[in-house]
């Protein structure tokens, strides 16, 4: 499966981004990817609310450490896993940077 995952991210300040993430051709479940992305972002937001001493850099560092651990746990050589991580990150980062910010509606 390949294609695009359209995902709306909203910051705590009410700025939204509609990101069109390209999916890897071997993606098994776009809905599963979307659900996990949502759960991870919600977990980060919840944790940050409780820990005001965390900086954006601290959050990015924790995510990188998590990614390194998960990449090491997959059934692939460390170099193959690293190459895949870089490929996936670069594509996702380009998509996120291409998304224009806008004010999210308030209910």
Language model segments and positions:
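Solvent-exposed interaction surfaces and binding hotspots enriched for charged
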Residues: 1-107
């Amino acid at each position: 499966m390949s294609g695009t995952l359209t995902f709306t991210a909203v910051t705590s300040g009410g700025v939204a981004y509609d990101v069109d993430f390209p999916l890897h051709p071997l993606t098994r479940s776009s809905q599963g990817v979307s659900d996990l992305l949502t759960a991870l972002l919600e977990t980060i937001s919840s944790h940050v609310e409780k820990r005001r001493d965390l900086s954006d850099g601290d959050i990015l560092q924790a995510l990188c450490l998590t990614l390194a651990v998960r990449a090491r746990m997959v059934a692939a050589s460390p170099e193959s896993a690293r190459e895949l991580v870089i490929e996936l990150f670069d594509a996702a980062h380009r998509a996120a940077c291409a998304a224009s910010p806008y004010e999210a509606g308030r209910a």
